UniProtKB/Swiss-Prot annotation:
It comes from Macaca fascicularis (Crab-eating macaque). GO terms for molecular function: DNA binding; zinc ion binding. This is Zinc finger protein 322. It comes from the Eukaryota. Significantly enhances POU5F1/OCT4-SOX2-KLF4-MYC (OSKM) mediated reprogramming of mouse embryonic fibroblasts into induced pluripotent stem cells, and can also substitute for SOX2 in this process.
Amino acid sequence: MYTSEERCNQRTQKRKIYNVCPQKGKKIFIHVHAITQIDGHIYQCLECKQNFCENLALIMCERTHTGEKPYKCDMCEKTFVQSSDLISHQRIHNYEKPYKCSKCEKSFWHHLALSGHQRTHAGKKFYTCDICGKNFGQSSDLLVHQRSHTGEKPYLCSECDKCFSRSTNLIRHRRTHTGEKPFKCLECEKAFSGKSDLISHQRTHTGERPYKCNKCEKSYRHRSAFIVHKRVHTGEKPYKCGACEKCFGQKSDLIVHQRVHTGEKPYKCLECMRSFTRSANLIRHQATHTHTFKCLEYEKSFNCSSDLIVHQRIHMEEKPHQWSTCESGFLLGMDFVAQQKMRTQTEELHYKYTVCDKSFHQSSALLQHQTVHTGEKPFICNVSEKGLELSPPHASEASQMS
């Protein structure tokens, strides 16, 4: 038997050896395998010949060689070498974050995550990127960041060969193949493949909009939507077309634009096999087969929601397009625009054509008139391949084909 003083000395010895241990094994047994003998028993790993003073440490070592992970999460079936790792993991599902920062009360599910966070308050950022000079509190964060410079994506999906820079992104991607959705909303029981998706969804119940614009005070539930909104104020358009160098604020807008160059029309109507460049155009077209939008006053149906809205104004006697100088109102915006043109007939015509001295209110009208003299027909109909001038009906015909 050991006295309390001897046991205290042993614990001190373990802590000291733990701090200077040159081995690269799991931290849970580093301090154990470095001690040759305490109570007279030595446990040796047959694979790597390391010696341990505790049988548990030997078992942990052997699992690193065999790949055995006996502890399984019953929520997502992920497996672990140690029971303590399983307990830490289960906090993700239970939303349990027992490690709280004393400075800002932010909570974490793992003590290592808390340690990394606390460095931000202490101003300690030990890990610096040698390419851009950015500092990080944890070496793992630096490693992931450096992949943004190198383009390295070491995590490969075995199903579709897609690569990722983060292991968490790969885990989330795999769920698109398995259909697994481990994160469930307690309010409506809707399930999600990613925790961030669940958090965003929960804000629909709470009404929380944590991302607020300091320019116009508009707020958002999603960080991605907030980033896109800020570009309205900054004018930033980071997504550039390689074919014509046109820039866009959103990646989705760039993808749609690029189809102008490639001719790709990925959205196909299963009724008539007609294809479209945008999903919104397909949805609008599909309504022509079903007559989706119905008036509640009459049994009249419409292909587009906008047509139904205009029709309903007849019942409500609503005329939203109001002339500022009198009480005249219009159901349709196009009627309002036509009236504006009539009222400005006597006003100055700014755009004059030098060949025939004809003048116009708008530059677009002047450009359209020029084609009468030049004979140019720059717009080609995709069906008949006829050349078209820029006139309202023909322009509409050309746009409907995309």
